[in-house]
Each structure stands twice: as structure tokens, then as C-alpha cells.
Amino acid sequence: MRISTVDRRQQLIDAAIRVIRRDGVESASLRTIASEAKASLAAVHVCFTNKDELMQAAAAELLQQLVRSIPRVVDGSEDVRAIAHRVMDLFWAQMVSDELNILAQFEIGIWAKRNPHHGDLSRTVYSDYEKEISKLLVAAAKRQKQTIAARNVARALIVIMDGCSLQYFADPSDPRHKDLCDNLVDAYLDRVGL
């Protein structure tokens, strides 16, 4: 049975994510990804120009998996502070329940930074994440008749997430990480008057 290019492309992206989660970016050769997807190497080259393009698609998919879950946990009546905490709670819950997914995102970002011709990948991923969080913050601010610098608040939340997640990965058994994360969010929101 023939598989459409669109379906094959998604299979390869999903296979790339599985390989990266299991073995890391350095082990994610096109041959390994093709094998994981039960596809030929030729099929990979039909769908993607090179490994860089496939890694970019995998990074975008990982981001979308995280972003798609955000609106489902947001109540339409919450204020900016509550939304900020809900976003952080969601991220934290996903990180704790699926550490490999978050590690894969970090690893793809680091891989992109080490490959100069793909340095924009991390910028694109973070920008997309900022946009999605900003939409939620803007909606909450409008309900409260507030004006906020939503992109700045979203960026700050992402910075806090990244720092706290690195601390968590250094010692997952330390129970203080989540409290520290919540305190950092509150301190930032207090500082900017939210």
C-alpha cells in the first residue's frame, strides 16, 4: 500500500521524535529515523531535503504538542496571574510526567545552536511559544481591562520554565523546585505590577 507524502512526512517526524527521545539528537541519523518509521532512506529524501529540515520539523512538532495542550486547561474567567500560573503548572506537569519530551526539546535547541546554518530554529520555536502564551495573557488582560506587555510576560515565563526545568533535571528528587518556580513567577508578576 502506498503512503501519501504528507502521511509519510508525519511518520518520519514522529519517528525522529521517538529516536531523539530514546537515543538523543546525535544518534538520530536519517538511516536510523527511516528504520524507526519503517521507511526507506529514499522516502526520507523525498519528504525532507536533509537532516536539518527533519530536525526543524521535529522541533516544531514537539512545540505544537506542548502548545496544543495549553488552551484546554485555561478557564475563560481567570486573570493574568492565574493564567501565568496555569501555564507554568501545565508545563511542570508535562515535564514531570514526560521528562524525555522536554529533554528532546532542549537537545534539539542545543543541536541547532551547534549547527550555525540552523541557529534560527531555537529562535523560531521560542517565538512560537511566546505567541501562544501571549494570546492567553492578552485575553485575560482584556477581561480584566488591563494593558500588559504580553510578549515580555510570556518571555519571562519561558525563561523561568527553562531555568527551573534545568534545576529539576539536575535533581528530580528535590521537592523545592516547583515552589521555587511558583515564587519566581509571583516575584516577576509583582515586579511588573500584575
Swiss-Prot record:
Keyword Transcription regulation: yes
Induction details: Constitutively expressed.
Pfam families: TetR_N
Keywords: DNA-binding, Plasmid, Repressor, Transcription, Transcription regulation
Every HTH tetR-type domain range: 6-66
A molecular-function term among this protein's GO annotations: DNA-binding transcription factor activity
Stored InterPro entries: Homeodomain-like_sf (IPR009057), HTH-type_TetR-like_transc_reg (IPR050109), HTH_TetR (IPR001647), Tet_transcr_reg_TetR-rel_C_sf (IPR036271)
Notes on activation and inhibition: 6-hydroxy-D-nicotine and 6-hydroxy-L-nicotine prevent HdnoR from binding to the IR1 DNA. Both 6-hydroxy-nicotine enantiomers prevent DNA-protein complex formation at micromolar concentrations, with the D-enantiomer being twice as potent as the L-enantiomer. A thousand-fold higher L-nicotine concentration is required to elicit a similar effect.
Domain of life: Bacteria
Keyword Nucleotide-binding among record annotations: no
Ranges annotated as DNA-binding: 29-48
Subunit structure of this chain's protein: Homodimer.
Role this protein plays: Represses expression of the 6-hydroxy-D-nicotine oxidase (6-hdno). Acts by binding to a gene operator site consisting of two inverted repeats, IR1 (covering the 6-hdno promoter region) and IR2 (situated upstream from the 6-hdno promoter). Binding to one site may stimulate binding of the protein to the second site.
Name the record gives this protein: HTH-type nicotine-responsive transcriptional repressor HdnoR
Provenance organism: Paenarthrobacter nicotinovorans
Primary gene name: hdnoR
